[in-house]
Amino acid sequence: MNGGKRVRPYMAALSFEAYGGKLNESVWRVLLGIELFHAFALVHDDIMDLGTDRHGTPTIHEFAKQTFKKQKRIGDLQHISQSHGILIGDMLFVWANECIFNQSKLDRNILIALQQIYTEMNQEVMLGQMLDVDGMARATVDDSHVLLKTSMKTAGYTFVQPLRMGWALAGSPKKFASFAESFGRPLGIAFQIQDDLLDLIGTAEELGKQPFSDLRDGQHTLFFAIHFYKRNKETERNLAKLHALIH
């Protein structure tokens, strides 16, 4: 739980209090569960991206590999450390579910509403991650592919679904779901675009990781998708050279 912005629980708390809710233990458990789900998603994402740094510290699987090397463990340490990372991510997912749903003080109808939203959030994240991984095996993707991936992988579970969960906790009507969609989806896409831009212009100290990590990992961001499809030939050659240099 080191570092991070806590955007998702903040969004849920904001919508909960905006509808008149008062924070209590049950609500705090849901907020913690949302953040634990985010931690689970990051751990698995780092493994799939072969990431080594997160918020200025080694990723879970990288920390495990470094530890195993110091202990002079034997075997395929890369595979073993990634396996540990997968299992730790799974455990975070279990804890997220327990925090959100193992509650006796929440109204049954509220729990049912939370379950529906949480399930939709899970599905969106998984499908978005599949698009992300699929893009890594493609030389180029167009901007519609990147926008769909961003909408599903980032915007939904960063803004749309946390807003909906906060309103559900407060017992609000389902009509607020459309507002969460129209407000949260564009905000989430903008959030990801800013993150992608910082990867290009930020420093290692500012980012908590090495810059150009997206390009190095073969990630197709909106900037590069637009450039590859709407730029001139000189820009195309320069981007291809940059991509080859980093790889």
For each predicted feature, which ranges?
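All-alpha prenyltransferase/terpene-synthase fold signal
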Residues: 1-247
